[in-house]
């Protein structure tokens, strides 16, 4: 099976590695010819998919299934359009993505289903963390440890920013994959982060605390 992975940074690198481990042939598309996943893919087409560069359209059409590995809204919309145009199965749900990319929407879903999540200011107590509702990779995240920092953060808070309790401890992740009526969870992984690279390593198996 040929899988077309669109996006060659962290997510795309993981996808190319796992595709190879599963015996699948990976076709990578990215506008940047120097992305890290380029060396892992069986085939790499560098070009602008949004502008429908001929080389990347040909690569797209040669795949059996399409896997977006990016968080660019314009590019994701184009991927959905092209998948429908060329009749390609798409491993992506736009409606689910609209929830998961928004911390406000995903927290609302957790609360509605009785799943604990950090309290929003003014509930809870210091330390807090201020971050954009959308986005990932710790971009725009600021830890608030004192009343003075909280006062300053409230004055500079941008539209769409949220302030929540800061939770100490390890970070875990679990994947859910499926189609309507048939979903399953996979192994729990631990996400390792540092100040220089944000997420620099994912490990499994994980021993969860009681």
Q: How does the language model describe each region?
A:
Residues 26-29, 117, 128, 161:
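Hydrophobic anchor at the start of a short beta-strand
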Residues 84-152:
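A conserved helix-loop-beta module that forms one wall/lid of the active-site cleft
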Residues 3, 66, 128-130, 161:
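Generic beta-sheet signal
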Residues 58-63, 124, 157-158:
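Glycine-rich phosphate-binding loop signature in dinucleotide/nucleotide-binding domains
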Residues 165-171, 175-210:
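ATP-dependent carboxylate/phosphate-activation module, predominantly the ATP-grasp catalytic core
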Residues 1-92:
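ATP-binding N-terminal substructure of ATP-dependent carboxylate-amine bond-forming enzymes
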Residues 33-37, 96-100, 193-195:
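Short gly/pro/ser/thr-enriched loop/turn and capping motifs at secondary-structure boundaries
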């Amino acid at each position: 099976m040929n899988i077309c992975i669109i996006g060659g940074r962290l997510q795309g690198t993981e996808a190319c590695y796992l595709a190879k481990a599963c015996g699948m042939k990976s076709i990578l598309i990215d506008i940047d010819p120097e992305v890290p996943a380029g060396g892992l893919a069986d085939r790499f087409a560098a070009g602008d998919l949004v502008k429908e560069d001929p080389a990347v359209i040909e690569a797209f059409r040669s795949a059996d299934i399409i896997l977006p590995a990016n968080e660019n809204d314009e590019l994701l919309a184009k991927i959905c359009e092209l998948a429908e145009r060329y009749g390609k199965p798409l491993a992506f749900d736009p409606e689910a993505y609209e929830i998961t990319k928004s911390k406000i929407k995903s927290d609302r879903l957790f609360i509605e289903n009785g799943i604990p999540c950090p309290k929003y200011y003014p509930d809870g107590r210091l330390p807090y963390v201020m971050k954009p509702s959308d986005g990932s990779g710790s971009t725009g995240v600021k830890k608030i440890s004192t009343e003075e920092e909280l006062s300053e953060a409230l004055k500079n808070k941008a539209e769409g920013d949220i302030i929540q309790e800061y939770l100490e401890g390890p970070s875990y992740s679990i994947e859910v994959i499926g189609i309507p009526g048939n979903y399953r969870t996979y192994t729990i992984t631990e996400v390792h982060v540092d100040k220089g690279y944000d997420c620099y390593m994912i490990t499994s198996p994980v021993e969860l605390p009681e």
